[in-house]
Amino acid sequence: IGDASAIWDDSENGFKSIPQNGDYSIRHDSLYLHYTSNNTLFGTQFHHLPDSNGKPRVLDASSDIMGVPLDVSAHDLIYAGAQKNLGPSGVTVVILSPWAMERVPKDIPTMLDYSVHSSKGSLFNTPNTFGIFVLDRVFSWIERNGGLEGAISRNKAKSDLLYKELDRSKFWIPHANKDCRSVMNVTWRLPSIELEEKFLQESLEAGLGGLKGHRSVGGIRASLYNGCPIESVEALVR
């Protein structure tokens, strides 16, 4: 729905970086700038607020919300699927500004109309009650364990520990450039596909699963979401 334009593309570089301010230009007739803060496939992440040239910012924060610092006030719309950091799939958290609420097109389908959902108290259709219940439990758990500051600190400690080990030897080949490495998804390669398969098999035998990279890119990927304890990273590093 709508006329969208991609204003930056790192495909020729293998998606190892994210755009810095000044690397792209925004169409003068654009209504907003949309970006995704964390790339789960390639392990890259924004660590700065992208310049929007005065346009409202719309953010997909599905894979790092409540896991890294986020300036909510700098955005007019933030949406995030809960299935990474907040709870089970089937629940989406949406944060809207008055600007976004006032600009819903009249001909948009009701299921995509945030104003409809807001006016009905998020009960326009039968909600995923179990998913919302689990979401509430996760929020309570985060509050009991240091709140957002605690979650952010734990995630940084986990990723710092793993990146330190990956940088220790040239045998490991981290994918993302250092200035945009993801705190949530650490991705790397080994010298050969055969060694990667051997690493994954031996990791599984040691009780460490879920390390295979996304099917579209391969390699190794460790997802360090809020629910991942630092003990898991310590075991991987050992």
Go through each PLM region and give its residues.
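A short linear hydrophobic-aromatic micro-motif
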Residues: 171-175, 207-213
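Membrane helical hairpin/interfacial module
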Residues: 1-3
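Active-site phosphate-binding strand-loop segment of PLP-dependent enzymes
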Residues: 10-65
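Active-site C-terminal subdomain of aminotransferase-like
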Residues: 82-164, 177
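Conserved active-site segment immediately N-terminal to the catalytic lysine
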Residues: 58, 72-83
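Conserved PLP-binding catalytic core of the aspartate aminotransferase-like
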Residues: 172-203
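PLP-dependent enzyme catalytic core of the Aspartate aminotransferase-like
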Residues: 214-238
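A short secondary-structure junction signal
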Residues: 17-19, 43-48, 67-73, 89-92, ...
